[in-house]
Amino acid sequence: MFDISFAELVVVGIVALIVIGPERLPAVARTAGYFLGRARRYVDQVKHDLHEEMELDSLRKLRDSMHETVNSFENSVRSEINKIQETTETQSAVIPDKQPPFEKAAENIEPVNTSETKTSSAPAEPRQPNS
């Protein structure tokens, strides 16, 4: 990280021992280690946040491209549906509605007048088939 060799660390340690003194050197070393650890965690957190933000940005771009694709597909499907509806509307306007055959037959049937029909009191007998 700082590119400090072992010899340079020994020189820094000897200077710190002379300047700070042997009584306060452990407390100063602990405090320095604590602040270096905090600084390292802070840098790691910033790196993590940047990496996460870059991933989110790429995911947003992917989402936007997917939305564009879905919208274009939806528009093409809607246009095809509209074409089909227009075609069926023009064809239904050209071809007149036909009545179903059973309704035509019902119109041609004349009502039977029950007063004119004869009823017989004798029971009906089956007819012999012709041979």
UniProtKB/Swiss-Prot annotation:
GO terms for biological process: protein transport by the Tat complex. The keyword DNA damage does not apply. GO terms for cellular component: TAT protein transport complex. Its main location: membrane. It is found in: Cell inner membrane. It holds the Pfam family TatA_B_E. Residues 71-93, 111-131 have a biased composition (Polar residues). One of its GO terms (molecular function) is protein transmembrane transporter activity. Coiled coil: none annotated. The chain crosses the membrane at residues 1-21. InterPro entries: TatA/B/E (IPR003369), TatB (IPR018448). It is a single-pass membrane protein. The Tat system comprises two distinct complexes: a TatABC complex, containing multiple copies of TatA, TatB and TatC subunits, and a separate TatA complex, containing only TatA subunits. Substrates initially bind to the TatABC complex, which probably triggers association of the separate TatA complex to form the active translocon. Belongs to the TatB family. This is Sec-independent protein translocase protein TatB. It comes from Nitrosomonas europaea (strain ATCC 19718 / CIP 103999 / KCTC 2705 / NBRC 14298).
